[in-house]
Amino acid sequence: EDTELKTLLDCAIVQALERIEESMSLEGDAIHKVLSDSMVVISEDVNSIEGTLENYRSELFTSMNKRISELLTNHKMDNMEQRLVQELAIYIDKYDVQEEITRLQSHIDTFRNTIAPNDNTDIGKTLNFIVQEMQREANTLGSKYSTSQSFKYILNIKEEIEKCREIVQNVS
């Protein structure tokens, strides 16, 4: 009787553990899909922003060149033209976001590689760090490149990163 009860109890425990493991696996698959989908959205938005950069640089240069020309004409400072052109180049470089875009793309790749199926079971801290870095780059991108055209992409990137941050807080 005790042996029979022990066998039934052992069987019930094994079944319960199998169900827990199956449930955890399904939850892990669902989390993986959400995180992967977010990386797709972020990547597409980063690529969209990158596609607008050349036009942005050109518009910025044209606008600043016009303003400088007006200043030179109105203030008769012809000897300052070369210096102003140099300042314009520095200004444009200051607002260049290619570096942030490149780093964001690198973080996306690292995130994807980290969540790829492998034997690494302790990825929560790594993902949290990557998400923090992505948020930092997105914030810098938003402060340097705030146009009406880029606003929706940057906002969407930040929302997706925040969604990922909330999820990875619970990943071990």
Regions found by a protein language model. Name each.
Residues 1-172:
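N-terminal intrinsically disordered, cationic/polar leader segments
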